């Protein structure tokens, strides 16, 4: 899980979702997981 100020999709499988007011990226590739914070 990478925590970044600005998150962006790395590949086409990455999906941007909002959970409890926190933006996250989930993907089939675990290396692409990101959270905005």
Curated annotation (Swiss-Prot):
Entry keyword set: Ribonucleoprotein, Ribosomal protein
Superkingdom of origin organism: Bacteria
One Pfam family from the record: Ribosomal_L36
GO cellular component labels: cytoplasm; ribonucleoprotein complex; ribosome
Keyword Ribosomal protein in annotation: yes
InterPro entries cross-referenced by the UniProt entry: Ribosomal_bL36 (IPR000473), Ribosomal_bL36_sp (IPR035977)
Any one of the GO BP annotations: translation
One of the record's GO molecular function terms: structural constituent of ribosome
Keyword Ribonucleoprotein: yes
Coiled coil regions in record: none
PANTHER family on file: 50S RIBOSOMAL PROTEIN L36, CHLOROPLASTIC, LARGE RIBOSOMAL SUBUNIT PROTEIN BL36C
The family this protein is said to belong to: Belongs to the bacterial ribosomal protein bL36 family.
Name under which the protein is recorded: Large ribosomal subunit protein bL36
């Amino acid at each position: 899980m990478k925590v970044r100020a600005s998150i962006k999709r790395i590949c086409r499988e990455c999906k941007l979702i909002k959970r409890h007011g926190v933006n996250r990226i989930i993907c089939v590739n675990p290396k692409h997981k990101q959270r905005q914070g």
